[in-house]
From Swiss-Prot:
SUPFAM superfamilies: P-loop containing nucleoside triphosphate hydrolases (SSF52540), Restriction endonuclease-like (SSF52980). This is Uncharacterized protein RT0391. InterPro entries: P-loop_NTPase, PDDEXK-like_dom_sf, PDDEXK_AddAB-type, Restrct_endonuc-II-like. It comes from Rickettsia typhi (strain ATCC VR-144 / Wilmington). Pfam families: PDDEXK_1.
Length: 864
């Protein structure tokens, strides 16, 4: 059953009754939202002269900053004291975070008139005595430093105002009505104790509960956010409250909301677009040139533009490792406009290089104004320029050893300032339980409703034990107690409709149901949502759906030239093959992507190719150490001419050095039994498939011909090598196809030019005869040559895995015969015949572990 009137409506009648009796009252509510709503009710319904209605914090909040030192200044004073204390070493970032803790502790000691010496002897352990000595020295120095400013701290200033207001209330003999539920803190405790004879409490009733409560458990936090957005969309004509006190979760929820909303939680300024813009500028100023940092700035929504997107595309792939701004202007620009944009950008960002904090902050402001002339006119601009101005004036307190640490410090300071996004016309409001609990809504959404979120345990003080806090008589449990959470929950259940959500997983952890909800289930039957009602309908795509969870798309053509890796892609990921080879879509390596394993593999292949091809001319007569030095020197020369991060070059040099000796020995040993070796040799295999000529191309890393005419095709691998089963089943066909190329003289090697290609491609092996596939007998002259040069030869494929840790070289060899190769060739032909004929490409989630084209299907299946 729902309460007939809301708490505020009942309270409004109570106020009218008091006023009729001639009682002068001052009304204090927990927050400003309740004050505004109560005033609106009194004006609309009763049309009376309003009594004084204020939120509790308005009693002591007087914005006259000349009377007290700012929070930033106080943090810097404490930070300086902490860093000077040599017994416990702190860097600047650590000292600022500790300053926030000590600031609260020291202000509470002053407000409560407590001597810190009370805890001096409670524990005689060496650890505690060190902590106590640290606290006492910092406390005394802090008091002295504050007194020298001839001002109060903000907390003490507000407490003094509160005491003055208490005296005024007593003199006026005015009744104070405290209506609602207030969070416990030292200010409220003092107010209640001093004015207990003047205060009238008006508390809400807990006797009602809605008959429209539903529950759902989405799979993860993103599904929960989608459900919230969908529920809001379905109920856009209603007054909706989303109740949460977690800013991270709120951000996820808001990313999915299409409607306007009011935000009572607020965002710290570092999370706003302007805050992120300033932080990105400071990161660029305080660090060496880095394209990732540059595009972190340029992709900011406030300055992102078409030129940024073009520049990013131009700098993707290998250009993403450019290490200096001067190299940017040496690139080939598609037009003068983009070149001019890039030149202006370099001039703005990289002309000056300040070394002190004042210079960094001043330059940050100048750069921000050049990049966005209207920056301070934005929604948060006024607050941010005030913060920046204050920080510049206090920057003399920042003693920074390394300016690379300053971005973290700036971000931390910025996080202490809140910005609120409130829209009067919005029907959705997001806030904490204490902000929304006494308001009436058409729909309440309680997301992430679990014990961790709704029954948080009080966090232990980082410096003081529970016993020490008891001795000091300081209540640090500022978080809402478990009892208050119960009250809030019961009051929220009085609204018309309540939707309770609890994502099964968040941050990799399983969620558990909240105890409050479990107790509710004992008394009431709570229906579960039908998931179909919570999932937005998806637009059907013009893609053929199949029962085996495949998507199929049709092409009008099939390429005539394929690489051996294209064949593997066609087997493992047909849709990826279609996107790459037919649509011509190639993945670009993004600016922020680190060098990949494949990049390292390409580097090693270049080194080994250059060494191997020049071995007979330059290195054959050298001793082992000189050969090793030559190999390493080749790598250094290649790295010198390659655009890569300095740390990557160093790592690759270390890896190359690690396996160089083992590779030299491996190479020497294999050369002993070889009469011919071919390196990085190009090959091709020509086929006619269903009337279409197909050419398959590939490059063999190394082909060895032994003195006994045995042939081995080697492939160097710096990553994982395929299993024997993958090779046998044709899932990794690279070396198999290279063998087929070899048999058909696709590598143009003279040793295999004795037979005509057309005859070689169709041979079958019998006991004593060789016939072609059309049942024609091979020319006897060719048969003699073939038997001498091919039949007696042993064909082997070998994967050589190269690593920078022992064992440095691992070789996996597989012997092949003509029958096996013929079966693989027949399978290759059948594969190509299917795609050349049908031109139908399916996508299967289980075929490929690495898939750059998955998102192109625009359709996702959930595995059952």
């Amino acid at each position: 059953m729902i309460a007939r009137y809301s708490f505020l409506q009942n309270f409004a009648e109570y106020i009218i009754d008091k006023l009729k009796k001639g009682i002068e009252v001052q009304i204090i509510l927990p927050n400003n939202l309740l004050c505004l709503k109560l005033k609106q009710i009194l004006i609309d319904k009763y049309k009376i002269k309003l009594p004084i209605i204020i939120p509790f914090n308005a009693i002591f909040f007087k914005k006259n900053e000349s009377d007290y030192i700012s929070k930033i200044e106080e943090l810097f004073i404490l930070s300086s004291i902490i860093t000077e204390y040599k017994e416990l070493p702190f860097n600047l970032e650590e000292s600022l975070k500790s300053a926030e803790i000590l600031r609260k502790l020291f202000n509470d000691l002053i407000i409560n008139n407590i001597d810190i010496k009370l805890i001096e002897v409670y524990n005689n352990s060496n650890y505690w005595q060190k902590i106590y000595k640290f606290l006492e020295i910092c406390f005394l120095k802090w008091k002295k430093a504050i007194s020298l400013t001839q001002k109060y701290t903000k907390t003490i200033h507000e407490f003094n105002i509160l005491q003055e207001e208490i005296i005024k209330i007593k003199k006026r003999d005015k009744r104070i009505i405290l209506a609602g539920i207030f969070k416990p803190n030292v200010f409220f405790k003092k107010f209640e104790e001093e004015l207990k004879d003047y205060i009238i409490h008006y508390n809400p009733s807990y006797n009602y509960i809605s008959n429209n409560i539903s529950y759902s458990e989405p799979n993860n936090i993103y599904e929960e956010a989608k459900q919230i957005a969908y529920i809001c969309e379905l109920n856009k004509d209603k007054h909706i409250a989303i109740v949460t006190n977690d800013n991270k979760l709120k951000k996820v929820y808001c990313n999915f909301l299409d409607q306007k909303y009011s935000d009572l939680l607020g965002n710290d300024l570092r999370r706003t677009n302007i805050g992120e813009l300033l932080t990105a500028i400071i990161k660029i100023i305080c660090n060496n040139f880095d394209l990732k940092l540059l595009f972190l700035l340029l992709k900011n929504p406030l300055i992102n533009c078409h030129s940024v997107q073009k520049l990013e595309l131009m700098l993707s792939n290998q250009n993403r490792f450019i290490s200096s701004p001067k190299y940017l202007l040496q690139l080939q620009f598609e037009n003068e406009e983009l070149k001019e944009y890039c030149a202006n950008l370099i001039d703005i960002l990289f002309t000056n290089n300040p070394h002190n904090i004042t210079g960094i902050l001043t330059l940050t402001q100048e750069i921000a104004e050049k990049l966005l002339p209207t920056i301070w006119e934005k929604e948060e601009g006024e607050v941010l320029i005030e913060f920046l101005t204050n920080l510049i004036s206090y920057s003399k307190h920042i003693n920074l050893m390394n300016k690379k640490d300053f971005p973290k410090i700036f971000s931390f300071l910025l996080s202490n300032i809140k910005h609120y996004k409130n829209t009067d016309s919005s029907s959705i409001i997001i806030g904490q339980p204490e902000d929304l609990v006494l308001c009436r809504f058409d729909l309440i959404i309680l997301p992430h409703f679990n014990n961790e979120h709704w029954s948080p345990n009080a966090k232990p003080h980082p410096l003081l034990s529970k016993k020490a806090l008891q001795i000091l008589n300081i209540d640090y449990n500022d978080a809402i107690t478990t009892m208050l959470y119960t009250d809030y929950f019961n009051l929220l259940l009085q609204n018309k409709q309540i939707v309770i959500l609890n994502a099964k997983k968040y941050n990799g952890k399983l969620s558990t149901s909240c105890n409050l909800f479990l107790r509710l289930q004992l008394k009431h039957v709570i229906p579960w949502f039908d998931p179909k009602l919570l999932t937005p309908a998806t637009n059907s795509l013009d893609i053929k759906s199949q029962d085996d969870h495949k998507l199929t798309t049709i092409s009008h053509s099939f390429p005539s030239v394929l690489s051996v890796t294209d064949i593997e892609s066609l087997i493992r990921n047909p849709y990826g093959f279609y996107a790459k080879k037919i649509l011509g879509l190639y993945k670009k390596d993004n600016i922020w992507e680190e060098p990949k394993i494949s990049d390292f593999g390409n580097f090693i292949h270049k080194v080994l190719e250059k060494y191997s091809k020049n071995y007979d001319k330059q290195y054959v007569c050298l001793n082992l150490l000189d050969k090793q030095a030559a190999l390493i020197n080749i790598g250094n020369h290649i790295l010198y001419s390659t655009i890569l991060p300095a740390y990557t070059k160093k790592i690759w040099q270390i890896k190359l050095t690690a396996f160089s000796k083992t590779f030299i020995l491996f190479d020497i040993e294999r050369r002993k039994n070889c009469k011919e070796i071919y390196f990085e040799i190009k090959g091709e295999l020509r086929l006619n498939i269903a009337g279409q000529n197909i050419k398959i191309i590939g490059i063999a890393d190394r082909i060895e011909v032994s003195k006994s005419n045995d042939i081995t095709i080697l492939d160097y691998k710096t990553g994982t090598i395929p299993t024997k089963k993958e090779i046998e089943f044709g899932l990794s066909p690279q070396l198999i196809i290279e063998c087929l190329m070899l048999l058909e003289n696709g590598f143009n090697i003279k040793s295999f030019s004795n037979l005509e290609t057309s005859q070689l491609s169709n041979i079958h092996i019998g006991r004593d005869t060789v016939i072609c596939s059309r049942a024609q007998v091979v020319n006897p002259s060719y048969l003699k040559n073939y038997k001498s040069s091919c039949i007696n030869k042993k064909l082997t494929i070998a994967y050589v895995r190269i690593t920078s840790t022992e064992p440095y070289i691992q070789t996996t060899e597989i012997d092949l015969n003509i029958e096996t190769l013929h079966k693989h060739k027949a399978g290759l032909i059948r594969l190509l015949e299917y795609y050349v004929t049908n031109k139908s490409f399916s996508y299967d989630f289980n075929l490929s572990n690495y898939n750059d084209y998955r998102h192109l299907t625009r359709c996702y299946y959930i595995n059952s």
